[in-house]
């Protein structure tokens, strides 16, 4: 279902999206083929995975798995075409290309197959066959790459663990993540992330899937397949990453597209390579990204779906596929993903719902669709799956040799990274984180798969990866944002007209979003945004509500609401300008206009904004994906929310909803629609559950964030600083209130949501802050913004708001969804610029960085002061988000990274960000990027300071890890072989001895007289030793035989 839309979207989206989509679709196909349900995803994933992994990683396990995957692949080919011609295409293309690399890389992976996972997994795999198979694959991959992949993805996945839990999901997630990774390595990140996330969520999501079903529904399917595939995908992805992305390509194809697209563009095929990193990021974020994608996917199902697909298609795709498929699962995950991505498991995990989780993905994570679908998202099913919390444990248990495919290619060097064992610190955290992640990821989820990831991240991206991915994506988003930033900046100028500013921001966000979509992050963002947008649009009513809010806001000046709406809507409205850009937007646009209308007060501003937006669009032009993205964002967003919600829902049912709900106020308007599904389900919990929220938040944030951001943005600068502080307090304070407040202040809520989204924990805090701030602020744009900011800071979403409010939101969302969150913030900060640029480069953090600069400017204004706080907050948030989002990726490492990283990041980031903010927007951007890149890496990156460095550092780190893993593998293998040899020799000796004894015994028996024998027997029975000689001889033989038996047996 998705597919078609996807296709359409893809088509619309364009090759990129196409590719992206493809990926997604591929996933679908994957899903179809791979697991039937998962198969599509799987297919893609599997295809990718299968293909690549098959030969490579999974050879053994692979074989088991692979077959299905391959089937998936095959199927993929065939399957996709129908539904996903695009996908197929992409996949094919990707597949083809990447595949080869995949193979190569994969081979590498194959090298170490050891993985505990394998057997069990395989069994499971087999058991699930698709799912499991995929899972297995993942696992296999895990073993091999997968481990790594899984790690990444699993991270997402695992992170999401859910994946494991899901088993299927896990596979999915992992696989997805992997696949995604591969696929989306770039996109993968998303995808994986998202998917990852979603995957985990997947299962959860599935129900949600339904929710999303409408949107997510497909996801659901997707979700499943996706998941499978996702896993596969992931796997593939991972491979891809590893392989390059070859796998990626395959699955990645699409995902890559998105990322790849971006990446592709950048890397093009590279997808494997370069993009991979982003992918990785994506991957990491992947989940998230995935999620994102997922989200998109979910979107796809819906209009958004298409949009999403379109916009973020690739990412989305993946996500969608993964996320979409997954995402939905993931969706929350990010699944939608969120997360990946957030949610999606993020996408949601984000992407979870975010992507899936958010739709997760996301963040994983990552991202969800599936999850989304499944979860909500299933979304991000993969991601989400990853996010699936349960799995985390399992995953955790897995040895995660994770391949951090964050930057897959980059890490080509060492493909293995044992990221963390995933032991799931994630498990617990993962789950939560996952949730978040998912949300984030799902909003990323990554794969997790995040997707946050694997997002490696996914989610980490998966997490790291995911995160990275997410980051990347986010960054991408950022890029988009960046693009927006320009606008923003401009807007900032217009800031005075805060509304416009806000709007601008919103736009930016939107743009950002759009770009987001481009980027995975973007996608995620997009998703988020889209979702929101879509939501907004979809929800025209919501929209209206938003408008109301807008009005409210408007009064406030924040308009954020409007923005929110506007942002979403507005954005949409603005988007209208962009509208053109965003096709999907069209639909939205209409709503948007309404929004605009509501905006009227703001309108002018809006107009400006709109006009600006055009600028943005222009900027976006670069981000042109943006438009598409934008839609997608809407779509995405929507999905994301869904996913997210879903994811959340799956994950935290509440959360999803909460987010939604919270956002509901606004987002609801916006998100609602999407969330409605997802959210709705979750709404109640949502708030509570940050996770869902995150995604939602993401979505919402985008809306809310946007709104808030938007409105705030202008203010932000001013408010920013204080807000930051404020926010924090607020955040903390308002934890409870937030929900109410959130609702209350739609914008606020939204922001809150964003905030909440950020991290469940955070979220609350975030929420609180945001709310508080928001609440207070709502009236005041600044306040809001601040809150948003605070939120942003606190939360990714918040971050989003913060940086771009909108952007950030978006980003945040994305971020939320995935690492993105982290990213987001940074992204936002940077992203805006990034986005514009990134479109192509997006992948490249670098670019983003660059872009970011501008953004930074804007951001700086806004974030500047805030940035720092933001940073810190961001970091926290980000970390959080990332952790969450990243969780996929991070997730694996999140605790570590998150905890440690977070802090580090916080401080570092803060500093870095600050610094960056201050002077180096770029730096900041870089930092941000870095963040995004990998939260973990972030830290490192922070050090690096440059986006690039971030990427590089991440890569370096990944490489090192991979190398270490390889070493470990080698040693392990040697050790095992030696042990085996020794045992064999011992057995031989025992056998010889035994035979000797037997002979001796026979001889003795022969020689002995019956009497003696009888006597001996009696003695033996009594235990009295007969003649020493005889007994011994006699006795020994028996003993020996026993030994022998055991020996032989052994």
Swiss-Prot record:
It is a peripheral membrane protein. SUPFAM superfamilies: Delta-sleep-inducing peptide immunoreactive peptide (SSF58026). Ubiquitously expressed, abundantly expressed in testis, ovary, uterus, and lung. Expressed in cardiomyocytes. One of its GO terms (biological process) is positive regulation of apoptotic process. Keywords: Cell membrane, Cytoplasm, Membrane, Mitochondrion, Nucleus, Phosphoprotein, Repressor, Transcription, Transcription regulation. Coiled coil: none annotated. Residues 1-99 are annotated as: Required for interaction with TGFBR1 and promotion of TGF-beta signaling. One of its GO terms (cellular component) is nucleus. Residues 22-111, 126-285, 445-479, 511-531, 581-609, 720-740, 795-847, 879-919, 1015-1050 are annotated as: Disordered. It holds the Pfam family TSC22. Its main location: cytoplasm. It comes from the Eukaryota. Residues 983-1004 are annotated as: Leucine-zipper. One of its GO terms (molecular function) is RNA polymerase II cis-regulatory region sequence-specific DNA binding. Residues 38-55, 85-97, 458-476, 906-919, 1021-1050 have a biased composition (Low complexity). It is found in: Cytoplasm; Nucleus; Cell membrane; Mitochondrion. The modification Phosphoserine is found at residue 265. Transcriptional repressor. Acts on the C-type natriuretic peptide (CNP) promoter. Acts to promote CASP3-mediated apoptosis. Positively regulates TGF-beta signaling by interacting with SMAD7 which inhibits binding of SMAD7 to TGFBR1, preventing recruitment of SMURF ubiquitin ligases to TGFBR1 and inhibiting SMURF-mediated ubiquitination and degradation of TGFBR1. Contributes to enhancement of TGF-beta signaling by binding to and modulating the transcription activator activity of SMAD4. PANTHER family: TSC22 DOMAIN FAMILY PROTEIN 1 (PTHR46745:SF1). Forms homodimers. Forms heterodimers. Component of a complex composed of TSC22D1 (via N-terminus), TGFBR1 and TGFBR2; the interaction between TSC22D1 and TGFBR1 is inhibited by SMAD7 and promoted by TGFB1. Interacts with SMAD7; the interaction requires TGF-beta and the interaction is inhibited by TGFBR1. Interacts with TPT1/fortilin; interaction results in the destabilization of TSC22D1 protein and prevents TSC22D1-mediated apoptosis. Interacts with SMAD4 (via N-terminus). Interacts with ACVRL1/ALK1, ACVR1/ALK2, BMPR1A/ALK3, ACVR1B/ALK4, BMPR1B/ALK6, ACVR2A/ACTRII, and BMPR2. This is TSC22 domain family protein 1.
């Amino acid at each position: 279902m998705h597919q078609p839309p996807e296709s359409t979207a893809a088509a619309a989206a364009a090759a990129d999206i196409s590719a992206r989509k493809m990926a997604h679709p591929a996933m679908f196909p994957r899903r179809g083929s791979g697991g039937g349900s998962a198969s599509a995803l799987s297919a893609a994933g599997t295809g990718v995975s299968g293909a690549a992994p098959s030969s490579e990683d999974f050879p053994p396990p692979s074989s088991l798995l692979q077959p299905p995957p391959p089937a998936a692949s095959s199927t993929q080919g065939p399957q996709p075409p129908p539904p996903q011609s695009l996908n197929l295409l992409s996949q094919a293309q990707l597949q083809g290309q990447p595949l080869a690399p995949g193979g190569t890389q994969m081979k590498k992976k194959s090298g170490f197959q050891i993985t505990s996972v394998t057997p069990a997994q395989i069994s499971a795999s087999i058991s699930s066959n698709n799912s499991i198979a995929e899972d297995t694959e993942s696992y296999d991959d895990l073993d091999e790459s997968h481990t790594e992949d899984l790690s990444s993805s699993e991270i997402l996945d695992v992170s999401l663990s859910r994946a494991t839990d899901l088993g299927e999901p896990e596979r999915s997630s992992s696989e997805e993540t992997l696949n995604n990774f591969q696929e989306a390595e770039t996109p993968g990140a998303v995808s994986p992330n998202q998917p990852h996330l979603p995957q985990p969520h997947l299962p959860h999501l599935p129900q949600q899937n339904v929710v999303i079903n409408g949107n997510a529904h497909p996801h659901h399917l997707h979700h499943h397949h996706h998941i499978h595939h996702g896993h596969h995908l992931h796997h593939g992805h991972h491979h891809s990453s590893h392989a390059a992305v070859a796998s990626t390509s395959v699955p990645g194809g699409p995902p890559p597209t998105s990322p790849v697209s971006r990446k592709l563009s950048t890397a093009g095929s590279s997808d494997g390579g370069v993009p991979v990193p982003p992918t990785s990021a994506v991957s990491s974020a992947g989940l998230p990204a995935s999620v994102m994608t997922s989200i998109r996917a979910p979107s796809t199902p819906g209009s958004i779906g298409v949009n999403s697909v379109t916009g973020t298609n690739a990412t989305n795709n993946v996500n969608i596929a993964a996320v979409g498929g997954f995402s939905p699962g993931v969706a929350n995950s990010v699944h939608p993903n969120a997360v990946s991505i957030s949610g999606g498991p993020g996408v949601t995990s984000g992407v979870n719902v975010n992507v899936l989780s958010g739709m997760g993905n996301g963040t994983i994570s990552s991202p969800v669709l599936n999850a989304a679908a499944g979860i909500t998202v299933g979304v991000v099913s993969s991601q989400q799956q990853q996010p699936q919390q349960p799995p985390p444990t399992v995953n955790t248990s897995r040895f995660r040799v994770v391949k951090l495919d964050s930057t897959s290619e980059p890490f080509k060097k060492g493909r293995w990274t044992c990221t963390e064992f995933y032991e799931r610190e994630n498990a617990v955290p993962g789950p939560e984180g996952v949730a978040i992640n998912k949300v984030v990821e799902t909003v990323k989820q990554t794969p997790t798969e995040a997707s946050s990831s694997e997002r490696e991240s996914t989610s980490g991206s998966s997490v790291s990866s995911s995160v990275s991915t997410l980051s990347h994506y986010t960054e991408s988003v950022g890029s988009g944002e960046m693009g927006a930033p320009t606008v923003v900046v401009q807007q900032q100028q217009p800031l005075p007209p805060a509304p416009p500013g806000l709007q601008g921001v919103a736009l930016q966000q939107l743009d950002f979003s759009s770009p987001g979509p481009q980027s995975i992050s973007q996608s995620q963002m997009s998703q988020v945004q889209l979702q929101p947008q879509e939501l907004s649009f979809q929800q025209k009513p919501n929209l209206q509500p938003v408008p109301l809010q807008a009005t409210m806001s408007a009064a406030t000046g924040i308009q954020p609401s409007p923005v929110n709406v506007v942002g979403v809507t507005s954005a949409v409205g603005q988007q209208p300008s962009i509208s053109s850009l965003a096709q999907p937007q069209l639909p939205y646009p209409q709503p948007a206009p309404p929004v605009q209308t509501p905006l009227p007060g703001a309108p002018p501003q809006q107009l400006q904004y709109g006009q600006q937006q055009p600028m943005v669009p222009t900027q976006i032009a670069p981000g042109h994906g943006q438009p598409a993205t934008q839609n997608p964002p809407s779509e995405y967003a929507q999905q994301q929310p869904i996913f997210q919600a879903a994811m959340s829902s799956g994950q935290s049912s509440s959360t999803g909803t909460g987010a939604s709900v919270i956002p509901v106020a606004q987002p609801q308007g916006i998100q609602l629609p999407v969330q409605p599904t997802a959210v709705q389900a979750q709404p109640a919990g949502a708030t509570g559950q940050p996770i869902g929220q995150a995604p939602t938040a993401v979505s919402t944030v985008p809306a809310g964030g946007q709104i808030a951001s938007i409105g705030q943005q202008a203010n932000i600068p001013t408010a920013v600083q204080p807000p930051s502080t404020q926010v924090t307090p607020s955040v903390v304070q308002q934890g409870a209130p937030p929900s109410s407040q959130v609702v209350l202040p739609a914008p606020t809520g939204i922001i809150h949501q964003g905030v909440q989204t950020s991290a469940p924990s955070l979220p609350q805090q975030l929420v609180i802050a945001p709310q508080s701030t928001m609440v207070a602020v709502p009236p005041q744009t600044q306040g809001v913004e601040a809150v948003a900011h605070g939120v942003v800071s606190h939360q990714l979403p918040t971050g989003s708001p913060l940086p771009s409010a909108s952007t950030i939101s978006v980003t945040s969302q994305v971020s939320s969804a995935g690492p993105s969150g982290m990213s987001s913030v940074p992204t936002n900060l940077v992203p805006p610029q990034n986005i514009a640029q990134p479109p192509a480069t997006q992948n490249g953090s670098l670019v983003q960085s660059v872009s970011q600069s501008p953004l930074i400017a804007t951001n700086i204004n806004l974030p500047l002061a805030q940035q720092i706080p933001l940073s810190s907050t961001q970091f926290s948030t980000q970390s959080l988000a990332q952790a969450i989002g990243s969780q996929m990726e991070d997730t694996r490492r999140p605790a570590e990274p998150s905890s440690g990283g977070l802090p580090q990041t916080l401080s570092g980031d803060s500093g870095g960000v600050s610094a960056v903010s201050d002077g180096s927007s770029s730096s900041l951007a870089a930092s941000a990027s870095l963040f995004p890149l990998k939260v973990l890496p972030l830290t490192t990156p922070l050090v690096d300071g440059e986006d690039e460095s971030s990427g590089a550092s991440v890569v370096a780190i990944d490489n090192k890890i991979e190398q270490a893993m390889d070493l470990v593998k080698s040693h392990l293998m040697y050790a095992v072989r030696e042990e085996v040899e020794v045992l064999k020799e011992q057995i031989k000796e025992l056998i010889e001895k035994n035979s000797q004894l037997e002979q001796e015994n026979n001889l003795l028996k022969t020689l002995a007289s019956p009497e003696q024998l009888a006597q001996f027997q009696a003695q033996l029975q009594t235990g009295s030793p007969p003649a020493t000689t005889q007994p011994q001889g006699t006795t020994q033989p028996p003993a020996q035989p026993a030994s022998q038996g055991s020996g032989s047996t052994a």
